[in-house]
Every structure is written in C-alpha cells, then in structure tokens.
C-alpha cells in the first residue's frame, strides 16, 4: 500500500507530465501553465482548483492517466480558463451556485473547443453543438455572467440543466465556496516554473498570458 507521500509524488508527476505536454503544444501558454501549484486533497473525488493549487485525488489522477490520459490535458486547460476568467472569485455572488457552476463550465468549454490543438481535442457531441448554436444566437458572447442571466430568466428545466452539467463538467468546483479572498500574487514553490519564451505578458491575478 502506497504511503501518502508516494501518492502525492505520483499525482505531482502526472500533473507535471500533463503540463509539459500542453506546454510543448502551446508554448504561448507557458506562464499560465506554470502559475498553479499541485496539492493532494482527499476532500475531492476528482480534481479542482482554488486559483492557487490544482487540488487532486491521486486515485482519480492515476486511473484517468492510465485509461484516458487525454481527459487530463483537457481538464488542466479547463481549470486554467476558470482562473483566467476569475470564475471562482464571483461564485459567492450568485444565488444559485449550481447554475453558476454550469454557466462557468459552458463558458470555458466553448473557449477550449475553439482552440485547435490536438492535445486538448475533444469530438463535439451533437448535444453540445446544438447548445452552442442555440446559445450563440440567444446570448451571443458566451460569458458565465451572460449565461447565468439567460438561464435565470427562462423557465427552469432541472432535467435539461443536469444533462448540460454532465456534458460540460470536468472539475470539482467545491473549492470555490471555501475561498475567503483572492490569493497573493506569488510564484508557487511546489514545482519548477515553466520556461517563458516571451517576456511580454499581461497579468490576470496570478495568471499571465502573452500579449501576442
């Protein structure tokens, strides 16, 4: 039976491998990819972020890495987008937390789906494509805030919303509700930084992305 230290080391190794694969495919994302530390957290059954760490259940990481490694690439990018759009910092401002979670997931997945990179490629289901087309017509720009307003103003359909959750959910948002304030802007020391090729960057809290 593995010790806690061994499990944490395995999880860190997997996430470092995922991060490296993403970096080799999307070097412009280097600063952002290096902005999150890794922390084992057995309060989650999967993986999530609090905008400082990617918090993971090692069993989930190991099983997914063996069976469907491409899902981890996608999930890592999904979590980075949540941080970029600062979704976790607005979570407590919305009355319906589950709906806010759903809208955040739709918003970030629409962005990731628009990124043409094999490492994060996912075949778009008919159901997903149908809803993208519907929302682009009725909401236009798919931000979490606009999507939340859209769903709040229409007749609520719990069955539909659950189907959408199953389609767009990739990470555990429970860490968002535990956050008290924004994290300090500092380099996490849990792993070495990703090399940065372009010094011209713009900062989004603790995330940085190239300006060109």
Q: How would you describe each model-predicted region?
A:
Residues 1-118:
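Basic/hydrophobic alpha-helical interface regions
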Residues 36-38, 129-131, 209:
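Short amphipathic alpha-helical surface micro-motifs
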Residues 96-197:
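Internal, well-ordered alpha/beta segment that forms a basic, Gly-enriched binding/recognition surface
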Residues 205-211:
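Conserved small/polar residues in nucleotide/adenosyl-binding loops
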